[in-house]
Amino acid sequence: MFASRPAVHPVEAPPPPDPAEQPRGVLMKDLPGMPGTAGGLGLRLAQFAFAAVALAVMASTNDFPSVTSFCFLVAAAILQCLWSFSLAIVDIYALLVKRCLRNRRAVCLFAIGDGITAALTFSAACASSGITVLIDNDLDLCSENHCASFESATAMAFLSWFALSPSFLLNFWSMASG
């Protein structure tokens, strides 16, 4: 057997420094777009605005409930509005009291929530764009439907997803590297 048996030699530790001089711990990098920053608040407000416009435009038509993908877009836009608005309020609070929101649990919660809402918003926008192309180009039924409203709502849903993607990627990267 060639197992090694290391000997442990005690090393005298230096005296602890003054508690006032100790670093407060390792903080994650303060990147624009992270929770609790002005960039993060801007992204949340853009997500909310685009999702609210998509919801308002789609709800203004009277025939959206007849197509399942449009109902899915409305449901995803409602969820996106609620999520983005609540996190925008949290960001405003963090900015006002100068509080750091980048602890591990908060970033994990933000990343998971952003991932779920991003997947729902993107899939709803893709499904709605497929139906819109079917109605407009393939069936030529735009004279009977609200194609411009459907296209506008779908475009706003994609813009909401584009505003959500940096938030998700920054939170996920921060969660994975922390």
Swiss-Prot record:
Topology, Cytoplasmic side: 1-37, 91-105, 174-178
Protein name: CASP-like protein 5A1
Membrane topology designation: Multi-pass membrane protein
Record keywords: Cell membrane, Membrane, Transmembrane, Transmembrane helix
Cellular component aspect of the GO annotation: membrane; plasma membrane
Residues exposed to the Extracellular side: 59-69, 127-152
Region of interest: Disordered: 1-25
Coiled-coil region list: none
Lineage of source species: Eukaryota, Viridiplantae, Streptophyta, Embryophyta, Tracheophyta
Protein's cellular compartments: Cell membrane
Low complexity composition-biased segments: 1-11
Family of the protein in this entry: Belongs to the Casparian strip membrane proteins (CASP) family.
Subunit structure: Homodimer and heterodimers.
Transmembrane segments: 38-58, 70-90, 106-126, 153-173
Predominant place of localization: membrane
Alphabetical list of Pfam families matching this protein: CASP_dom
Xref: InterPro entries: CASP_dom (IPR006702), CASPL-5 (IPR045009)
